């Protein structure tokens, strides 16, 4: 998936700069959205890590606690080329907690450990707080104007390049799999390839909506989502004026599909628009249906919360903001500046 071909909401930036000159320039802190219970057969462990990916730390925790790897879980993957604070969950039914004071892994620090009644599962995360440092910025005035636009209107809610693997390989493999040119047995690879397929189709439809200036224009049959919620409903023709007002006010979001084996969910004009966008994606659609993946919807636009900018000097910007789970910080940066050096560091979920 070539991110350069996707439409910008605020036009292509004139400024360029560097994201993540070092890992400390990309800091991510998980927000579970709940407080641990303080009791239960699960142990939630919050770890600050630098230079370690999520699965590596989870496997190390399993060995340290003498647990099967399946008994250690987490809410979302984080890249190793960043400073991240994330939670891991150890299932310890009837067992004492391991002595985490003796836990040693280069680049990792245990911040706290709390008992909890439920397993921490993928996606059981409210969001993430980011603190980024953008360096060697060439046009401060353009960046400042874009920050104001982003605060008011948001950014496209695109899946970032990491979703598609290095060089887009996950999508390449998905197409080979769809055409029965390869067999994919590993569960993790199947998941990556299917996720890349659905994400690419979402990005494509969202980009077309932006290109036709329809990112905030309600079509008859659109699937609309209450801001901050996952559920959605279909816009009826006799409600368009009222629904348009609610979208403009930020109460509702227009969505695009993450296609599955069921119908897209839209009707009428909106359905025709989405079908036209997907007309040339028969390979990926057939794969999704063949593997019986459940479909869902995702907001076309994303508005960062609690966004604060702090210029260290005329070419260095510290930027902090909060995003809901599943959203990509690089999709925010993409609307601010062109990156002089490509870097796939990002949050995955």
Curated annotation (Swiss-Prot):
Domain TRUD, which positions? Answer: 154-302
Which residues are substrate-binding?
A: 26, 128, 328
Q: Which GO-annotated molecular functions does the record name?
A: RNA binding; tRNA pseudouridine(13) synthase activity
Ordered alphabetically, the record's keywords are:
Isomerase, tRNA processing
The catalytic residues are 79
The EC designation for this entry is 5.4.99.27
Q: What is this protein called?
A: tRNA pseudouridine synthase D
Q: What organism is listed for this UniProt entry?
A: Yersinia pseudotuberculosis serotype O:1b (strain IP 31758)
